[in-house]
Amino acid sequence: MSSSPVNVKKLKVSELKEELKKRRLSDKGLKADLMDRLQAALDNEAGGRPAMEPGNGSLDLGGDAAGRSGAGLEQEAAAGAEDDEEEEGIAALDGDQMELGEENGAAGAADAGAMEEEEAASEDENGDDQGFQEGEDELGDEEEGAGDENGHGEQQSQPPAAAAQQQPSQQRGAGKEAAGKSSGPTSLFAVTVAPPGARQGQQQAGGDGKTEQKGGDKKRGVKRPREDHGRGYFEYIEENKYSRAKSPQPPVEEEDEHFDDTVVCLDTYNCDLHFKISRDRLSASSLTMESFAFLWAGGRASYGVSKGKVCFEMKVTEKIPVRHLYTKDIDIHEVRIGWSLTTSGMLLGEEEFSYGYSLKGIKTCNCETEDYGEKFDENDVITCFANFETDEVELSYAKNGQDLGVAFKISKEVLADRPLFPHVLCHNCAVEFNFGQKEKPYFPIPEDCTFIQNVPLEDRVRGPKGPEEKKDCEVVMMIGLPGAGKTTWVTKHAAENPGKYNILGTNTIMDKMMVAGFKKQMADTGKLNTLLQRAPQCLGKFIEIAARKKRNFILDQTNVSAAAQRRKMCLFAGFQRKAVVVCPKDEDYKQRTQKKAEVEGKDLPEHAVLKMKGNFTLPEVAECFDEITYVELQKEEAQKLLEQYKEESKKALPPEKKQNTGSKKSNKNKSGKNQFNRGGGHRGRGGFNMRGGNFRGGAPGNRGGYNRRGNMPQRGGGGGSGGIGYPYPRGPVFPGRGGYSNRGNYNRGGMPNRGNYNQNFRGRGNNRGYKNQSQGYNQWQQGQFWGQKPWSQHYHQGYY
């Protein structure tokens, strides 16, 4: 009998993960892997004994089996499998939807190797988040749920005697490996990519051998080296997701706010999209949910100055807890405060004429850093001074009223009377400002200094304003294959129209992740690939935020499929929607991609390029666009080239699989027995379109898969099993776990998605997913939005 107080074999998957998180160990993998890892850690804690030995570890079935009959073991195993399946069923069903989407989506057909490669990349992208422990990441849950069902469920179904014989030998091998890794806290950014053979051997040692044989091509958890899995590959994976759902409804327009334009405040136009500004425009924070925790967010004040001696105050109100991001090597909280020109970017201190003082006690300008002043923290107040009355413009700071001296000196000739604007850059922090609106400042200021709000209006300079109406806003969608020259065109066009466009592309997202000091930390620890994987995920949510803003945008992505074009442009209803097609000659395209591969390395596998060629569709004015521009080949020539590409794709790739039309699958259970009884027939996890009481023994348990036409919560809102009526919960009532409201019925449309009912399940905030439309906007209308805690941020279309 093990001396450990934790009996590992009796823990569910969620409990195993919780125990592993307490010990700062990785919680990814199949249930067998989690059990081995936890048991090894427990053995080490108990005194460094071997991780798994027959008769000594709590996982050994031999001692327990002696006191129970075989039938009892089978019943316990079946009950455990059902409980685990209930926990993970939604994730598994979501995983099935992913597979169907891959088959039916814009990617077309692919051979078995290509499909495995996609699944492995999707797993790498979202499962091993390398330090980014994201509870809301639906793709990570898919991998865990599907993996646990496929692996652990097979183990549970083994006869007790066979299980007892197999486990000791399995545990010894896996336990030694786990023991070696659990000697200290493990950074989850560290990822080991094992060769396919070794990885398969590990899975078989974990009890997943039968599943691999039965599953055929569905090999989950197999990781492969990714020589050609760079930025382009993750963009390609993200782009395919647009083929899986119906076109979204246009977002609800923002309410027109009547705000006194003479007041100095944070400017809602001159800020990042993910910079959350309060309604009074005097406080703000960066978004922190999901992958946004990696991004820096900044904004400027509405007015700047070019004369006198002026100041403003900034208080760090909170370092927002980022519970889904754990790392001991990366600074996850930071604030920079200072001044910049209106032509400068939002990354304070990363350009010329952009001056910032950091929470770490560092001053930064044009990516050059130097120690300055003191470090500051929560509840500290930083006063920023700009003195234009000396021979050189002097920028200085004070911490809690204590002068820190001059930080920057700027030549007036170089500055050329251009105004400087208050500017802040946040990384998982919340701040508030005093531009002079307070009757009494946080700390006294020199008598000869004036708050910027108190400077006469004629001596202040208003920052640039955005379009007044949505009809005046412009969105330009780039369309073209990877490496065709889209970004080159965007860079040139933006330079010809300075300050007009917000560019939404992977490059811009990466820039907001890799601020100079942070970039160096990531490079030193070898974690840049984490950002590379997260950037395309953020970009999709950026586009949804952008559709609510009155600005001009350029979408710098491939957008080759008709589905991606349609679904993105549907969000921008009311905008001037334009398309720019970059389609060079085939010879030119080959030269460009070869040159790019020589400089940046190959980042997209050949089969992915072939799929994109096969799905390349030229846009039409009548559909989603008001205007279409062809940069190189014109429409007729481009159409001929695309026909050539489609033939090339068709010959190189296997025949396209038959698409799922959405009809019900035939019931494989021909017995016709009670399908809502656990004991026989189909368990009724999903797929039934229940319109009335056509079932036995009262209403079935609320297992989360029946189409109730929106009348009741789905997951856990009402429990019950067997003949218990649906109003009676099986256990603790958690309406709206956050999965699809129709989670499991074969007709997956028609109802709002992800997070429809309960907004606070398990403390994950107000909306697990980001596609719920009605709930989020109601929340905004009810005035609850700014009452939320910052760490409860979960993006949805009405969020912001």
UniProtKB/Swiss-Prot annotation:
Residue list for modification Asymmetric dimethylarginine: 691, 696, 703, 709, 715, 730, 737
Modified sites of kind Omega-N-methylarginine: 678, 709, 715
Pfam family, one: SPRY
Residues covered by region (RNA-binding RGG-box): 690-715
Disruption phenotype: Mice exhibit early embryonic lethality between 9.5 and 11.5 dpc. Mice show retarded development of embryonic ectoderm at 6.5 dpc and growth retardation beginning at 7.5 dpc.
Domain free text: The SAP domain is necessary for specific binding to nuclear scaffold/matrix attachment region (S/MAR) elements in DNA. The RNA-binding RGG-box region is necessary for its association with inactive X chromosome (Xi) regions and to chromatin-associated RNAs (caRNAs). Both the DNA-binding domain SAP and the RNA-binding RGG-box region are necessary for the localization of Xist RNA on the Xi. The ATPase and RNA-binding RGG-box regions are necessary for oligomerization.
Name of this chain's protein: Heterogeneous nuclear ribonucleoprotein U
Species this protein is from: Mus musculus
Gene: Hnrnpu
